[in-house]
Amino acid sequence: MERIPYRDADLLLSVLGEHIGKELLTVRSGRKIPNRWKSSFLEGSILLGRIMKVKNHHVLTGVIAEKYVPYEQQYSPFMFLALEIFSKIPSLDRSSFNLLEKFLTSEHRAKDFDQLLVSFMINESLQPSLNSCVVCGEKREQFPISASVFLGGYVCSRCGSGDIELNQADYESLLRTYRKVGELTENMRSYWLDILESQLSTKFLSREGLK
């Protein structure tokens, strides 16, 4: 999640651990850590894997900096899916991690996950296109357009009416309206997850847990 400047021969890494929390690790090196490692590998787990395979580089210490404990004893399938999604993102900024942190400290309801999913995809510019109807795929000709919060995008006049009129490709307006409406339907949640899988060229195995 973060690379924290420390010393030429050491490096502090903040990583998301298997215990569903954040660990702060100190990497001790026998020689100066190459700059290409610090800049090329954005995921702490990848960098740690490289360091642990090279002579004179090893993890010196590790402490739990933060820990996120769900309200219920049993973990929600939405929580596993959220963690899998974030584990497959090449790099994350602080605002995206804050969305995950907020979800991990929530009650893990469908509504909580939907807020995370939509906010994250819009924040990372991974949302469905506003250039074609989300129902039939017909290309839009011009603005203004009718957009559906539940469908997650533009809806042409033949396929129904939306919840909001947009005068430009403005997902922030759609997101603000969505937050007032609440959770997605199961079909619409699946549609957004399909879009995310397509954008990331991957499949989320944890989706099976939602059935």
Whereabouts are the PLM-identified features?
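Non-catalytic alpha-helical scaffolds and adjoining flexible linkers that form interface surfaces
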Residues: 1-11, 16-211
